């Protein structure tokens, strides 16, 4: 019953914001129209809004889980139209906080001790509140300032109920929408379910932060807060408290004397290093999660502060290599290579003609190269390439789509800090240096050295394994020879059977013909009372039947 009321509310909100137009021609749209008389008249202001804005407003009204749904949907540019994706990026994940006393109970249950024994001070008024969790300031007994992230009470059940409802809606859309094969609604919901499941485990988020901190511990480009593991559990995450300026607060950055030009270049370098050196990148890098260190001593050498580690990205080694090669091919305007890489990577089927892909890549990239370099977006070029490649049955892993969205965010932050930022000039040497290091003989030797214990462990078994493999090959060949002989014998048997069947059919036919000729008494030669042709036909037919019987 609860699910029914929730579904009715969703339908009501969809009609209020004219989202039935997104379901044109489907059974779902017809059902929604039946409910129109029970929905207040749609205001002219809403009607005039774009479909993307109407969807964004509807998701905000439906509540925090649907806001999160919209945010995740905005990262899947391969599944949603560009105008809708651009609007969903603006969704704000801000909701009313829950009671501080409730937060204390959750913390005590998760950590197995009282708040007083865990913290010298705990502020029950949250610093920030979002759909999944909220953050409180606290001080440890050793006087270190920390922030405590606490999951919302009963959030797992709320998400489970809404996901179940979304799955039902996705199934309905898949069976009724004419473009369901392009929208792939069930794939979208599955992606949302996976992402939300990861965000519900704060211990996992702590592990992400810890790994990222280890990669950048000695860096002047970005700082990752320390995880306080003694105060962290599945529903509670405690981190070192950071003070900084949001990267989109340009006025405050200027007032603090921060070198924005140096900062913007660092952002691009950090991203490419995370992707191609560490293979572990912050995949939710919008301005709210990327701050700038406000330490006055860092005005001329500023650094970023990373926050919120719920969504991290990793690529397979194969995708990592082909993506890097794609970037280099774009830098060199080598459209043939771009086309070849898409096929070699398995993103596009082998049967697609390289020449067609090359022409498509040229049509995408050339218009961008007529602009000044400072106005070229590598993320936009990549997104357009993938969009065009969808015509050729493009298949991409979700992590690649996540990277594309992150690159778009990073470039946006960089251009906000420095509108004249030349991403190509900054990114190219970083990428070339990382690729040279990654595929150098030294790196190969390092990888070999890393795997040496494993190699040495299995080395004594190698001769036996080789001998076993050779024996299997010989046995397999013998077995194949036996099978071949059996097949040949069977083929000969079938050929003989075929000949006997033919002889039997011919013999029967000739005997029938002999009988008919005998009965008709045709003109011509006779041997006694028997027509010669009847006699010949009968003899040949009898011989053919005897041949078929004798061979059997």
UniProtKB/Swiss-Prot annotation:
<comment type="similarity">
    <text>Belongs to the ABC1 family. UbiB subfamily.</text>
</comment>
<keyword id="KW-0997">Cell inner membrane</keyword>
<feature type="transmembrane region" description="Helical">
    <location>
        <begin position="530"/>
        <end position="550"/>
    </location>
</feature>
<dbReference type="GO" id="GO:0005886">
    <property type="term" value="C:plasma membrane"/>
</dbReference>
<dbReference type="GO" id="GO:0010795">
    <property type="term" value="P:regulation of ubiquinone biosynthetic process"/>
</dbReference>
<comment type="function">
    <text>Is probably a protein kinase regulator of UbiI activity which is involved in aerobic coenzyme Q (ubiquinone) biosynthesis.</text>
</comment>
<comment type="pathway">
    <text>Cofactor biosynthesis; ubiquinone biosynthesis [regulation].</text>
</comment>
<feature type="binding site">
    <location>
        <position position="149"/>
    </location>
    <ligand>
        <name>ATP</name>
    </ligand>
</feature>
<feature type="domain" description="Protein kinase">
    <location>
        <begin position="121"/>
        <end position="504"/>
    </location>
</feature>
<feature type="transmembrane region" description="Helical">
    <location>
        <begin position="501"/>
        <end position="521"/>
    </location>
</feature>
<dbReference type="GO" id="GO:0004672">
    <property type="term" value="F:protein kinase activity"/>
</dbReference>
<keyword id="KW-0067">ATP-binding</keyword>
<keyword id="KW-0831">Ubiquinone biosynthesis</keyword>
<keyword id="KW-0547">Nucleotide-binding</keyword>
<protein>
    <recommendedName>
        <fullName>Probable protein kinase UbiB</fullName>
        <ecNumber>2.7.-.-</ecNumber>
    </recommendedName>
</protein>
<keyword id="KW-0472">Membrane</keyword>
<keyword id="KW-1133">Transmembrane helix</keyword>
<keyword id="KW-1003">Cell membrane</keyword>
<dbReference type="InterPro" id="IPR045308">
    <property type="entry name" value="UbiB_bact"/>
</dbReference>
<dbReference type="InterPro" id="IPR004147">
    <property type="entry name" value="ABC1_dom"/>
</dbReference>
<dbReference type="InterPro" id="IPR050154">
    <property type="entry name" value="UbiB_kinase"/>
</dbReference>
<dbReference type="InterPro" id="IPR010232">
    <property type="entry name" value="UbiB"/>
</dbReference>
<dbReference type="Pfam" id="PF03109">
    <property type="entry name" value="ABC1"/>
</dbReference>
<dbReference type="GO" id="GO:0005524">
    <property type="term" value="F:ATP binding"/>
</dbReference>
<dbReference type="InterPro" id="IPR011009">
    <property type="entry name" value="Kinase-like_dom_sf"/>
</dbReference>
<feature type="binding site">
    <location>
        <begin position="127"/>
        <end position="135"/>
    </location>
    <ligand>
        <name>ATP</name>
    </ligand>
</feature>
<feature type="active site" description="Proton acceptor">
    <location>
        <position position="284"/>
    </location>
</feature>
<keyword id="KW-0812">Transmembrane</keyword>
<keyword id="KW-0418">Kinase</keyword>
<keyword id="KW-0808">Transferase</keyword>
<dbReference type="GO" id="GO:0006744">
    <property type="term" value="P:ubiquinone biosynthetic process"/>
</dbReference>
């Amino acid at each position: 019953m609860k699910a029914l009321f929730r579904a009715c509310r969703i339908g009501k909100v969809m009609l209020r914001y004219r989202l039935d137009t997104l379901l044109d021609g489907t059974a779902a749209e017809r059902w929604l129209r039946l409910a129109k008389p029970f929905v207040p008249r749609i205001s002219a202001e809403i009607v005039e809004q774009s479909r993307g804005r109407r969807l964004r407003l509807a998701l905000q009204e439906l509540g925090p889980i649907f806001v999160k749904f919209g945010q995740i949907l905005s990262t899947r540019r391969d599944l949603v139209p560009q105008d809708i994706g651009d609007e969903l990026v603006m969704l704000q994940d801000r909701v009313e906080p829950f009671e501080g006393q409730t937060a204390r109970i959750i913390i005590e249950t998760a950590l197995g001790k009282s708040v007083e024994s865990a913290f010298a001070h705990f502020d029950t008024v949250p610093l920030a509140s979002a759909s999944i969790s909220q953050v409180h300031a606290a001080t440890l007994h050793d006087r270190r300032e920390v922030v405590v992230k606490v999951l919302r009470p009963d959030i797992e059940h709320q998400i489970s109920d809404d996901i179940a409802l979304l799955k039902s809606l996705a199934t309905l859309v898949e069976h009724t929408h004419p473009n369901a094969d392009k929208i792939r609604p069930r794939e979208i919901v599955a992606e949302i379910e996976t992402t939300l499941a990861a965000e519900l485990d704060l211990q996992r988020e702590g592990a992400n932060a810890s790994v990222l901190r280890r990669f950048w511990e000695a860096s002047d480009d970005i700082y990752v807060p320390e995880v306080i593991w003694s105060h962290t559990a599945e529903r509670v995450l405690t981190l070192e408290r950071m003070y900084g300026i949001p990267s989109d607060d340009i006025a405050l950055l200027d007032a603090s004397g921060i070198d924005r030009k140096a900062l913007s270049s660092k952002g691009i370098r950090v991203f490419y290093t995370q992707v191609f050196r560490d293979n572990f990148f912050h995949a939710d890098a919008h301005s709210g999660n990327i701050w700038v260190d406000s330490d006055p001593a860092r005005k001329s050498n500023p650094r970023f502060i990373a926050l919120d580690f719920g969504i991290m990205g990793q690529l397979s080694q194969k995708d990592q290599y082909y993506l890097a090669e794609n970037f280099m091919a774009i830098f060199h305007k080598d459209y043939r290579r771009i086309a070849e890489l898409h096929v070699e990577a398995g993103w596009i089927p082998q049967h697609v003609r390289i020449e067609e892909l090359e022409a498509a890549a040229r049509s995408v990239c050339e218009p961008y190269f007529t602009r000044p370099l400072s106005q070229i977006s590598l993320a936009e070029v990549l997104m357009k390439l993938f969009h065009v490649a969808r015509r050729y049955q493009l298949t991409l892993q979700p992590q690649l789509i996540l990277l594309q969205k992150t690159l778009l965010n990073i470039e946006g932050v960089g251009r906000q800090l420095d509108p004249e930022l030349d991403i190509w000039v900054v990114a190219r040497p970083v990428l070339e240096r990382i690729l040279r290091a990654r595929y150098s003989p030294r790196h190969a030797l390092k990888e070999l050295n890393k795997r040496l214990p494993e190699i040495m462990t299995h080395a004594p078994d190698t001769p036996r394994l080789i001998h076993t493999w050779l024996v299997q090959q010989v046995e397999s060949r013998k077995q194949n020879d036996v099978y071949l002989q059996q097949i040949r014998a069977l083929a000969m048997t079938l050929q003989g059977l075929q000949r006997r069947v033919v002889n039997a059919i011919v013999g029967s036919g000739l005997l029938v013909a002999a009988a008919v000729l005998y009965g008709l008494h045709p003109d011509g030669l006779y041997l006694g009372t028997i027509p010669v042709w009847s006699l010949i036909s009968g003899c040949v037919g009898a011989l053919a039947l005897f041949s078929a019987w004798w061979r059997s």
